[in-house]
Each structure stands twice: as structure tokens, then as C-alpha cells.
């Protein structure tokens, strides 16, 4: 029976992995981890409540018949247990803890690209707080326990909307895709994790100055666009000394809802066709729908973000990036060459 569970565990795990990989479903790892945890849990229960009691009874009978205490080697020959299945069942407590922590508390995340430099660098390993905005189920991302709402300036990890994955620089194409998707599907969620900073939330009007590359946000009221007595936040910028890590970029301190550094490429120019168009709004202006968020990367001219593909539904948000626990000295798509010890255990601002 134990060997049968072992075969079932391997077969189901492999089959589910192939199916999820084929359909490119969101939360693939969470689904697979849940299944493996459940199967190992069944195997653990079978060992704990069926196999071991039966073995103890057989050993007791054998000792009673022989009139002596059996050695461990002699006991092992009575009702032998498959080492493979015993090992897999022993993984259940570990898998259960990993599943619970990763699903509801914290999840590790690695920075694969430079879209958030210089705040986050390629090779940084982060801890993402998954209960900062409430507790969600790990499969469908439905809220189980409500928490605080994401705020402007928060650095968040989220499931990229489908239109963000279209390999094009034309915002109009992505907008058309997003509209068609909205008509055919309730959810707009891919299996790809992005990390960006929230610039605007529901009701906010975000204005990006294409020439100066500066931001202005007209705050909404309770998720709705403001009509009168509106509060407007014009972000302030001061230039920093040249950062040796980014000698070809201009590093600025941006003072908005939070104060942090951004990188600008002086020679990057934008075309109106690049931006995500919104009906009734001028180019490079967006009115954030209620329950959604406008996000941008801190590496402003090397970030594929809401300016080009639109908004992030609240349901897509995985959690809040809180701190860097380790950092490797590396570039994108290259092997690491060392450690950035000065970045270990630093808070993300």
C-alpha cells in the first residue's frame, strides 16, 4: 500500500506540473505545493494511523511468542515499510509549514531585472509580506481576511495583467487586448510576478510629464475622481551625485508620497504611441479605476509599467516588499560574482 501511494504521488505531481505548465496558470507553484502537501499528508496519516499500529501489534505478538524483546533489525523484518514512502510521508510536516508560511505570511522573491534600480538591484533577494493587505487564499487570490489597503509609495509584488506580457511597445495594442480580455474573462491575471511602486490608486489622476519626466497626482476621494477642492501632489526632484553603480544614468531623489531615488536616462525619448491610452484622457494622463492601482518602476526609462499597459487590479497583488535579506553581485542573465553585504537585511523604502 505504501509503494502504491509513492507511485501515485510521483505520477500526480508530474501530471499536474505538466498541465499547469501547459496552460500557464497563475500561482502554479502554490497549486503544486498544495497537492504535494495534501498527498504527503495522506501518506503520513496512513503511516501514522494504519501502518505503525499494525506493525506494533505484529511486533508485540512476535515478542510474546518468542518470549524475548526483538532487536531493531528483527523488528524491521516484521511488516517492512518502504523507505521511499516513509521518507515522503516524513516530508509532510515540512511541506505543511512551507505551504502555510509561503501562502499566508512571507514569500521569498528575487529581482531578475533592473526596472526598480536603484532601490532594488538585480541579484537582490526580498521578503514579501503576504498579510500586509489582508489574507488571501493562495490559489485564486480571493480575500479571506481583509487588511489595510495598499498605499501610494508602497513597493508591491503582483501578478502581471495579461496585456503586460504582450511583446510590443504600442500602448494602443495593449489597451485593445485589455478591453477584449475584460469582455471574455473576469480575471486579468498571468502567472508572471512583477515588482513595482504604487504611484496612484483608485480615483487618482496620474500625469506624467513626457519632457521633464516628472509626476503629478491629483488625489481621488474614497476611490472616486475628485471634482472640487482637489489635493494635487507635484513630485519634487533633486539631483544626486553620480552613482558609481549607474555611471550612465542620472540619479534623482523623488519626493512624493514617499522619498526615494529614481534613475533617469537623459537620452530616452517617448512617443505618444507607446503610452496606454485611456478614453477621455490626454496622452500620458490616466484616471485610475476604483479597486485598481497605477504602478511604475524606479528605473523610469527602463521599466515596463502602467504607463504602457494600464492598471493592476487589487486582486492581483501578492504582497508588500518589506526588506532585502540577501544580495548577490550580478547582472541580468549572468552568474553572480560575489555578495553585496551592505545590502543584507536592509528595509525597502
Swiss-Prot record:
Gene3D superfamilies: Umud Fragment, subunit A. The keyword Membrane applies. Its EC number is 3.4.21.89. The keyword Transcription does not apply. It is an enzyme of class 3 (hydrolase). It catalyses: Cleavage of hydrophobic, N-terminal signal or leader sequences from secreted and periplasmic proteins. It is found in: Cell inner membrane. GO terms for cellular component: plasma membrane. Residues 46-80 are cytoplasmic. The chain crosses the membrane at residues 3-23, 25-45, 81-101. One of its GO terms (molecular function) is serine-type endopeptidase activity. It is a multi-pass membrane protein. Residues 102-349 are periplasmic. Pfam families: Peptidase_S26 (PF10502). Keywords: Cell inner membrane, Cell membrane, Hydrolase, Membrane, Protease, Transmembrane, Transmembrane helix. The active site is at 115, 196. Signal peptide: none annotated. InterPro entries: LexA/Signal_pep-like_sf, Pept_S26A_signal_pept_1, Pept_S26A_signal_pept_1_CS, Pept_S26A_signal_pept_1_Lys-AS, Pept_S26A_signal_pept_1_Ser-AS, Peptidase_S26. Its main location: membrane. GO terms for biological process: signal peptide processing. NCBIfam families: sigpep_I_bact (TIGR02227). Belongs to the peptidase S26 family. This is Signal peptidase I. It comes from Haemophilus influenzae (strain ATCC 51907 / DSM 11121 / KW20 / Rd). The gene is lepB.
Amino acid at each position: 500500500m505504501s509503494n502504491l501511494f509513492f507511485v501515485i504521488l510521483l505520477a500526480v505531481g508530474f501530471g499536474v506540473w505538466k498541465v499547469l505548465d501547459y496552460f500557464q496558470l497563475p500561482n502554479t507553484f502554490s497549486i503544486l505545493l498544495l497537492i504535494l502537501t495534501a498527498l504527503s499528508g495522506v501518506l503520513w496519516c496512513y503511516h501514522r494511523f494504519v501502518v505503525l499500529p499494525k506493525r506494533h501489534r505484529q511486533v508485540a505478538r512476535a515478542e510474546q511468542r518468542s518470549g524475548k524483546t526483538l532487536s531493531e533489525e528483527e523488528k524491521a523484518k516484521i511488516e517492512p515499510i518502504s523507505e521511499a514512502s516513509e521518507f515522503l510521508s516524513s516530508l509532510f510536516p515540512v511541506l505543511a509549514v512551507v505551504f502555510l508560511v509561503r501562502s499566508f505570511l512571507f514569500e521569498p522573491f528575487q529581482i531578475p531585472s533592473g526596472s526598480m534600480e536603484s532601490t532594488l538591484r538585480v541579484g537582490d533577494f526580498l521578503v514579501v509580506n503576504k498579510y500586509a493587505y489582508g489574507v488571501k487564499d493562495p490559489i485564486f487570490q480571493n480575500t479571506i481576511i481583509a487588511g489595510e489597503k495598499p498605499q501610494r509609495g508602497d513597493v508591491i509584488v503582483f501578478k502581471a495583467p495579461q496585456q503586460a506580457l504582450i511583446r510590443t511597445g504600442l500602448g494602443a495594442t495593449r489597451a485593445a487586448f485589455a478591453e477584449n480580455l475584460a469582455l471574455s474573462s473576469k480575471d486579468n491575471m498571468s502567472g508572471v510576478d512583477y515588482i513595482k511602486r504604487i504611484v496612484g490608486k483608485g480615483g487618482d489622476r496620474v500625469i506624467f510629464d513626457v519632457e521633464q519626466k516628472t509626476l503629478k497626482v491629483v488625489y481621488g476621494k474614497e476611490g472616486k475622481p475628485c471634482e472640487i477642492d482637489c489635493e494635487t501632489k507635484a513630485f519634487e526632484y533633486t539631483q544626486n551625485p553620480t552613482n558609481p553603480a549607474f555611471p550612465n544614468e542620472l540619479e534623482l531623489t523623488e519626493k512624493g508620497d514617499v522619498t526615494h531615488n529614481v534613475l533617469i536616462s537623459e537620452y530616452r525619448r517617448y512617443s505618444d504611441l507607446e503610452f496606454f491610452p485611456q478614453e477621455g484622457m490626454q496622452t500620458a494622463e490616466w484616471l485610475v479605476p476604483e479597486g485598481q492601482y497605477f504602478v511604475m518602476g524606479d528605473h523610469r526609462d527602463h521599466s515596463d509599467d502602467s504607463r504602457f499597459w494600464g492598471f493592476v487590479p487589487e486582486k492581483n497583488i501578492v504582497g508588500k516588499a518589506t526588506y532585502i535579506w540577501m544580495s548577490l553581485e550580478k547582472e541580468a542573465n549572468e552568474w553572480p560574482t560575489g555578495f553585496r553585504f551592505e545590502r543584507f537585511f536592509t528595509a525597502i523604502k
